[in-house]
């Protein structure tokens, strides 16, 4: 964390710390599609673009690592906080959290999901058809409050960095665990172990 803080002090080339800080897998309607298009065009012209062609496989490893961290907790009841591809949007296209959810469903996990932006989109948004037609099985797992997630889950997964989830994490019970994909919680002040993606238990709240 201290090393990353130093890197992010550059204000000339680094227009935003978000470009340098490590995070979870990316998604959305643009970047994955653009990478596939560039890689395809490179193959057509017999060009080697090792950096570009390694990005999507690397992204897949991040998704697999996130799933592994949940599985390692050993709890079958899981609550997901945020599953749009980033905070503040209802866009679910190529969301990496959806891929994690699909794999958990395949493994028989008992899931509930909360995302306030997607809850609204399910009723009136442009993504309504996507939610109802492409992922109806996931839509059925959605709940309307963070309280419902905390009541259900033994493992709570923070899927995007909505500021709301920082406050929710403070209400996690001692017998619950948190897997934080996006560093919503501040590991520097918690003294918690960090292993790849940031994961936290009750110690993250300063408890002993």
What does each of the following model-derived ranges do?
Residues 1-208:
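Structural/interface elements that position substrates and couple domains in central-metabolism enzymes
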């Amino acid at each position: 964390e201290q090393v990353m803080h130093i890197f992010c002090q550059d204000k000339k080339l680094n227009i935003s710390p978000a470009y340098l800080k490590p995070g979870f897998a990316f998604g959305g309607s643009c970047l994955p599609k653009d990478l596939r298009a560039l890689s395809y065009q490179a193959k057509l012209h017999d060009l080697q673009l090792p950096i570009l062609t390694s990005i999507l496989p690397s992204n897949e490893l991040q998704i697999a690592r996130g799933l592994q961290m949940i599985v390692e907790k050993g709890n079958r009841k899981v609550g997901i906080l945020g599953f749009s591809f980033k905070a503040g949007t209802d866009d679910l296209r190529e969301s990496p959290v959806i891929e994690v959810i699909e794999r958990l469903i395949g493994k028989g996990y008992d899931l509930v999901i909360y995302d306030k932006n997607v809850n609204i989109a399910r009723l009136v948004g442009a993504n309504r058809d996507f939610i109802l037609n492409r992922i109806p099985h996931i839509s059925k797992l959605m709940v309307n409050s963070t309280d419902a997630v905390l009541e259900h889950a033994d493992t709570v997964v923070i899927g995007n960095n909505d500021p709301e989830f920082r406050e929710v994490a403070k209400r996690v019970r001692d017998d619950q665990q948190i897997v934080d994909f996006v560093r919503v919680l501040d590991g520097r002040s918690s003294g918690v172990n960090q292993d790849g993606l940031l994961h936290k238990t009750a110690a993250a709240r300063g408890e002993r």
